Structures are given as structure tokens and as C-alpha cells.
Amino acid sequence: MKLIEQHQIFGGSQQVWAHNAQTLQCEMKFAVYLPNNPENRPLGVIYWLSGLTCTEQNFITKSGFQRYAAEHQVIVVAPDTSPRGEQVPNDAAYDLGQGAGFYLNATEQPWATNYQMYDYILNELPDLIEANFPTNGKRSIMGHSMGGHGALVLALRNRERYQSVSAFSPILSPSLVPWGEKAFSAYLGEDREKWQQYDASSLIQQGYKVQGMRIDQGLEDEFLPTQLRTEDFIETCRVANQPVDVRFHKGYDHSYYFIASFIGEHIAYHAEFLK
């Protein structure tokens, strides 16, 4: 691991590290916020998964989460959204390739060699965090848009690994919307059965459950009618008896202005599960 950046903020330390990711076969960066913790007590960890086009930088520079992580004494980890590097396959479009890993394990070439983000987020990154920082072994996960999709899928499929899950403006039925259909076709092939393991709505229909989930969605979000399918997800959860707290917010869009407005409530929500 190599320290790339370090900034003091709200009494704690916002850091960016680089490491050679075996799962992805490339160098990866991740951000970690360490609240002021002079006694080096073990703390819970919240993983944040960002959306399309993002790196590890967007969340740490735009959301203002550090104030709340410091207050609630939680470590927050924000990885990049895909493998990176000149040797890593890419696409000219914003919604495929680098910056658009979709938090899955690709099976199709040329993507399969590097695009194993599901395994990276589930196993390699937490192992690295827990070996190098003062953690208590408890994890929660949250994300935005493509990252909200990733957070929900990881939590549903690995209930024992995450204490809680939340999302901002998540892609809830990627198998049925343009973003997901494009990415899944490329990464997983044309067999739609293979897509279902990375579709939160489908997982709930299959019987996967979590203790509860929290979702915030802006009503001025330009992607709400075509890409997110929030109302359908609420109905899927109702039929499956899966508790979900979805809050719609008048006037808010898909941007980090929306995330910054409510990130404090999400940090507080997860902190209760991480004690």
C-alpha cells in the first residue's frame, strides 16, 4: 500500500491509498476517512460505492460526509468504481468500461480478466482495510446510482457480512433498464438468467432478504422514470415482505447536492448498527 493523499478534516484524516489489486490485476486507489481516535479503539467501517464516471474522489470532495463520520466515530472507505490503467479494457461511452464497473464479476472477454469488482469489494478490499486500520470487524455498505445497485446486491447476497445497507437513487432493476442492459450484455453475455444475481429486485423475488434497507430518492431526478424503477421496487419488497424505507424528496435531483443534503442521516443510520 502506498499513501497518495492525506488531509486533516473535522479532526480526522482523509487519506487516499494505492495498492496492487490481485482480484482486478491492476493498481487501484481507495479513499479512507479515519476519525480522530487517539486511543486507537476498533471502529466500524462503512463502505461507499460511487456511481457512473466516478473515482474515489467524488464522494470525499463533494458529499461532506466527514463531519458526520467524525461525529459518529466510524471509518468510511470509498473505492474506485472500476479497474484502471492503460492495459485495462475500456469503452468510449461513459456507461461501460472504466468508471462503469457495475460491481459485478465479468465473465465475457475482454472484460473478465480485470472487471471482478464484486469480489474486490466483498473480499480483497475489506481484508486490506481490516489488516491495516483499527476496525471492529463490523461493516455496513451504501452507495449512489450504480453504487446503490452495488450496495444492495452485495448486502442481499451476503447478509452475514454487512450490518446494514442504504442507497441514494439506486438502479434497482438493472436487468430491465438501458444502463443495466448495456453493461450486463457486455460483461455477462446475452443470457439474462446470469444477470439476475446482480439485480436487487430479482434477488428479492428469489427470496434474498436483509434486516432492512434505507433508500433516498429525489423527485426531480432525470433518471427516475427510465433507469431507476423505484416504485416497482417498493412493490417487489411489499410482496416479498422485505422491509424497506424509501423516502422521496421534492425538488432534489440525481447529483451530489442531493447526497450532501442527506448523507448525515445515512451515516447516523449505519453507526447504530456498527457499535
Swiss-Prot record:
Listed EC numbers: 3.1.2.12
Domain of life: Bacteria
Organism, scientific name: Haemophilus influenzae (strain ATCC 51907 / DSM 11121 / KW20 / Rd)
Biological role: Serine hydrolase involved in the detoxification of formaldehyde. Hydrolyzes S-formylglutathione to glutathione and formate.
Key word Hydrolase present: yes
Chemical reaction(s) catalysed: S-formylglutathione + H2O = formate + glutathione + H(+)
Family, similarity comment: Belongs to the esterase D family.
Transmembrane segments: none
Active site: S145, D221, H254
Keyword field contains Hydrolase: yes
GO molecular function annotation: carboxylic ester hydrolase activity; S-formylglutathione hydrolase activity
GO terms under biological process: formaldehyde catabolic process
Protein's name according to its UniProt entry: S-formylglutathione hydrolase
Entries under SUPFAM superfamilies matching the protein: alpha/beta-Hydrolases
Annotated GO CC locations: cytosol
Enzyme class, UniProt record, top EC level: hydrolase
InterPro entries, per the entry: AB_hydrolase_fold, Esterase-like, S-formylglutathione_hydrol
Keyword set, alphabetical order: Hydrolase, Serine esterase
